[in-house]
Amino acid sequence: MVTIKAVFDNDTATNLILDGDGLDGFANGAKLDLLRAWWAFTQGTAAANTGDCKIDFVGASSDVTALFLSGTGHYDGSAGAIKAAATNTTATSSDIKGTTRGTSGFVILEFRKDEAYA
């Protein structure tokens, strides 16, 4: 299991929130499946701010959205894990990024390593 917490303070950016090749047992092409998530977000102060956060699995040519979050909530995993569907066989194959638009708050993400991890 891998659990991370990302905190945002009136942030409008794309942030790498998990650098997967730094995890124990990483091998190129290894993936992380999203098991559970908890979040609480509010909108920033600028008029164009939305107060949301998009969580992506980083892909080789395009990223794949895992969750699009706003407000307060949780995903308890009872519907099953959200599989890492990004096509990637390089050192970024387990990377996770978050994109925010005028967002303050946090997200806690719990992942499971796939069988490619040693």
Regions found by a protein language model. Give the residues of each.
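Short, surface-exposed beta-strand/strand-loop-strand elements in extracellular ectodomains
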Residues: 43-69
